[in-house]
Amino acid sequence: MLKKTLLAATAFLALASGAFAEDLKEFRVGIIGGENEADRLKSYQCVVDQLPAVLGVQKVSLFPAADYDGVVQGLLGGTLDYAELGASGYAKIYLADAKAVEPILTTVQTDGSMGYYSILVARKDKGFKSVADLKGKKLGFADPDSTSGYLVPLVTLPETVGAPVKEFFAETGFGGGHENLVLEVLKGTFDAGTTFGSGVGDFKDGYTSGNLRKMVDKGILNMDDIVELWKSPLIPNGPIVVRSTLNTDMKSKFKDYMMNLPKSDPACFSAIEGGDFKSFVEVTPDFYKPIIDARKATIGG
């Protein structure tokens, strides 16, 4: 009996040590949709190059998802180790399984703020002067799991227009991410659409950071072609999350690497975050409680 017990314990330890070793071989990075895949992979290449030595893994693999939910499901399923999410995407994970991931950091803008805005844009040549002019028109959202591209306008636009979104607009739809949404507005698929920006600086420049600024910098958007019709209250910057079951040593090394990145490699930091950011700051789930509550009340899990 004792021999069987010892053999069973030995087998268990072998499996456990094997699982631990496997955990250290590869670090898996989820990248949410929003811009084309080639640009997303290019932005994260510095992480692929640097993290193996930092974490002691053999390789870092990038998994760009077609939409936000691809990364959400990967994190819920334990097949991703790290991702940067919008607050609503994190809320979706939290409501499904509060212990699946840990929010560890978020970004800080150069002006010290820790938030951004949902921005409603339309083609300038449509002649819309305010959001009131959009009554009975077609509205495009970025993605069902986007904070600025769906959740926040769904909750706060009714306060401006005096009616629920589905009653005020004749039709709503999704553009397939922020970049695609703006392109669809320009094509005329939607009369207006929701995207995001820092709200700092000039609209004519695409603000200092956010989707509009990225599109301007990439040469695929002329700000003279669009107008801003509405801007939301401040939205908390989304979190960097890690898989909760990731071993403690790796979590600590990864967190330290990210915290130091703005100084150790400003170019890499800028490539990942884009625009007007200066550093990271630690966060906990409590920072996102208002978004979690808003999502639970309006969308559900």
Regions found by a protein language model. Give the residues of each.
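Sec/Tat signal peptide C-region and signal peptidase I cleavage site
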Residues: 17-21
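An extracytoplasmic/periplasmic, membrane-proximal ligand-sensing/linker region
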Residues: 24-31, 35-46, 52, 211, ...
